[in-house]
Every structure is written in C-alpha cells, then in structure tokens.
C-alpha cells in the first residue's frame, strides 16, 4: 500500500489536473450511486448483466475523446462490460429520458456543494436569488445508419434538450431531453415548471416568453428575466421612462400587465433597451419582462442581467471544442441524448476543477488565462497511464468523502498546478481571404515551387 501511495503522490505532483479529474469522477459517478439512480428512474429497462454505471464508463471514453467510437470503447472495456457489443448497443439505444435527465441532476447536486466548499463559486448575479439560465440545444444531425434512414436524403435529427445552468456554480444542474428534433421547446415547459423553486430567478430568451411559462414561474412564487416575444399578449402599457444606459444602449422601463392562465391580471416590469447597434436579425430595440422588484435590481441591472444569458452559449461552445457529446453514429434518439448528457456531466467535472483553480490562484487569473482545451488535453494525455499505474482501491475513498473533505483534497492538488502550462493562446484578428483566382485552369499546384518563387524557400 505504501508503494501505491507513493505512485499516487507522484502523479498528484506531476499531473495534478489528471488526479483531480479522476477524483471528481469517483466522487460524482460512483458505481453504486449510478446503479441506484437507474433503478429509481428506469421504467422499461432492467439491469441484467450490463450495469448502468458501466454504460456511463463506456460512453465517457467516447465523449471525452479517449476512444474514437463506442465499438472501440467496448473493445477496451470488454471484460468489465461482461456482455456482447450487440447487447451494449441495444441498451444504449433504449436508455430512457428519465434516466438521462436523472444522471445530469444527480451529478449537479453532488458537485454543487463541492464548488461551495472549495470557495470557487462566482458572486450571485442578484443577491438573495438563485439564478438559473435555461436554453435549448438541438443535437447535430446523425449518419443514416438506421434502416428507416438509409433512403432518406434529409438530415436526421436525433433530438434536443433544454439545459439549465447555475451561473454561480457554473454547473449544468438540469436537463430536459426530447427525442423529437422537430418538437417546439414549449412542449417541455410543463416539465421545467415542475422544477421551479421559490426564489429562483430564471433567465431565458424570447422562445420562453409564453403566458403559461411566465405565470407559472410567478405562481411558485419565483422570478424571471425573459426577453419579450413579439406575439406575447400584453394587456396594458404604463408610461415609458428613461433609466440611463447599459453596455448595449439606452435603457427605459414601464409597467405592463397580462392575463395569466386563470384569467388573473398579472403586473410586471418591461425593460426596453434601444440598442446602439442592431442585432443580427435587424432589431433596434429589445424588451425584457421581469417581476424582480426594482429595489433588488433596477432597470439597468435587469438589462445587464439578460446579457448573462450568453453564459450558457459559452458552455455549449466548450462542449463543442473539448468533448464529443454529439456522436454522428448514434442514430437512436435515446443513445444520442444519453451521449449529450455524458458531455454535460464531463463539463461539470471540469467546472469543479476550474472552481478549485479559481479558489487557489484567483478568479481573474484563471478565467482570463486558463484554456479549457489544454485542461481537457492534459487529462486525456495522462489518464490512461495513470489508470494502469494506480490500482482501483486507491480511488475508492473519494466516493464517500463529504463535500468539505473533497474540497480540501482538490485545493491540495491544485497547489501543484503550473498554470503557465494551460495558458490560453489568443489569436489575432482574422485576415480576410483574398479571391482565389490564380492557377484556376490547373487541378493542383506544387506548394514548394510557389514558396521558391516567393523567396520563402531556399
């Protein structure tokens, strides 16, 4: 055991990012907890020989780019899977939406206290409220592998999901999957309203601006900051008054009313921003509905608050750049949505790691200088070797640690991180591409000869 501890300590000093990643995975995705979650949420599938925790492990190898495909991941884990590759795919294709959503919620609730204990949370956007940002994500089209798709020319969409981000913890805390890629987002609003808690503050784009959604939030009672949809039925408008400026333009406010679901007249604030520059759709002003009291957030603060909606777009960008959560080979909606959920879970692990770095090195330094890509690449490069060198039993204690104990370990390992190894490289402005008119009559050219003609090759 002393030898094992010595090997572990060597990894903790030389590649602390990889050790922190594995420790967080053990804490958030312990096999016993995952299999219990499956039993709790599954209605049609049953465990048999193939455990849900094993499914998570297999898919994580693919999503985290440690293996190029599910089949390759199966080959690596064939002994642990204990079933045929056909059985693996069959179970993937049948994973139920409740199980997929439950996985994201479980990991969010497991890691949130760790972020708080490590001291890496961001300041609340509005003190006294728990802010939640919600947005939709349509999964990319898949390959035409399924029999029903082989003679279809149109791109096959495997589904979509609404994702909820806690911007203070920077964790994806909820997911509402939908297998129908053509369904309207509002078809999921009833499920979302079921998750609204007292004193929540929901930020969303205009697709979420419906009578049922706004009145449903207000009835909890909770709060919203949602962009006005052009078709929203406003019953009355008060006087529009100037309230100064925000980053994007002049700010105005007025009182408005609308009829709720039960015919009750509901009063709220309408914040108007007359933009300095039109949006890409040509809008010169935007309206924002909110029921947050003015003493808690004035008109300018609400206008700035709505801009925080782009934080979740940044999360989706991180998923695209560092993970493969949308596998083109997974045509069945159940499997595709499960893969996307694994990407959210993996992002959450990285977000806690980043919170530990913020607590150790300071918010500004980490957020401005540290690259998500290089952090992910460090774990990918060292993970396999560490897995071979360190026995499973060494990681077991992380599964049962409290949030406080886990936070102490993370800070201990974070102190060994050399941030300069993960420094973000900012590229300069893009150079406009000149018209490609030379050698248009030839199928190809010799790069070496062109460099020689330009004096760039000797």
Placement of each model-derived feature along the sequence:
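Residues within the helices of the helix-turn-helix
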Residues: 71-75
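Single, function-defining residue in the core of a domain
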Residues: 1-70, 80-95, 102-110, 114, ...
């Amino acid at each position: 055991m002393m030898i094992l501890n010595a090997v572990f300590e060597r990894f903790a000093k030389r590649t602390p990012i990889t050790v922190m990643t594995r420790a967080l995975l053990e804490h958030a995705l312990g096999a016993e907890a995952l299999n219990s979650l499956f039993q709790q949420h599954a209605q049609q599938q049953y465990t048999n020989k193939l455990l849900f925790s094993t499914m998570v492990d297999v898919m994580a190898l693919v999503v985290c780019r440690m293996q190029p495909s599910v089949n390759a991941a199966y080959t690596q884990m064939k002994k642990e899977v204990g079933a045929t590759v056909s059985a693996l795919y069959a179970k993937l294709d049948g994973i139920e939406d409740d199980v997929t959503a439950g996985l994201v919620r479980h990991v969010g609730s497991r890691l949130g206290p760790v972020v708080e204990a490590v001291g890496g949370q961001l300041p609340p956007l509005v003190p006294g409220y728990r802010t939640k940002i919600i947005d939709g994500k349509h999964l990319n089209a898949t390959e035409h592998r399924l029999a029903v798709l082989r003679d279809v020319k149109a791109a096959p969409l495997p589904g979509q999901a609404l994702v909820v981000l806690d911007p203070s913890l920077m964790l994806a805390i909820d997911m509402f999957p939908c297998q129908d890629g053509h369904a309207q987002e509002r078809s999921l609003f009833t499920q979302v309203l079921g998750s609204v808690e007292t004193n929540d503050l929901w930020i969303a784009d205009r697709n979420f601006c419906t009578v049922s959604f706004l009145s449903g939030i207000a009835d909890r009672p909770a709060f919203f900051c949602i962009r006005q949809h052009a078709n929203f039925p406003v019953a009355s408008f008060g006087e529009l008054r100037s309230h100064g400026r925000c980053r994007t333009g002049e700010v105005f406010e007025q009182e408005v009313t609308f009829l709720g679901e039960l015919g009750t007249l509901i009063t709220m604030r309408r914040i108007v921003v007359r933009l300095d520059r039109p949006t890409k759709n040509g809008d010169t002003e935007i309206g924002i509905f909110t029921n947050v009291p003015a003493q808690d957030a004035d008109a300018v603060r609400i206008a700035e608050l709505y801009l925080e909606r782009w934080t979740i777009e940044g999360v989706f960008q991180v998923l695209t750049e560092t993970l493969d959560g949308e596998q083109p080979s997974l045509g069945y909606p159940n499997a595709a949505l499960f893969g996307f959920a694994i990407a959210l879970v993996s992002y959450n692990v990285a977000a806690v790691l980043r919170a530990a770095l913020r607590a150790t090195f300071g918010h500004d330094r980490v957020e401005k200088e540290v690259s998500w890509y290089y952090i992910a690449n460090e774990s990918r490069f060292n993970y396999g070797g560490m897995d071979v060198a360190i026995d499973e039993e060494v990681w077991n204690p992380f599964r049962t640690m409290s949030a406080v104990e886990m936070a102490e370990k993370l800070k201990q390992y974070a102190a060994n991180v050399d941030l300069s190894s993960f420094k973000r490289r900012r590229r300069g402005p893009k150079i406009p591409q000149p018209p490609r008119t030379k050698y248009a009559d030839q199928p190809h050219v010799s790069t070496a000869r062109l460099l020689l003609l330009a004096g760039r090759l000797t």
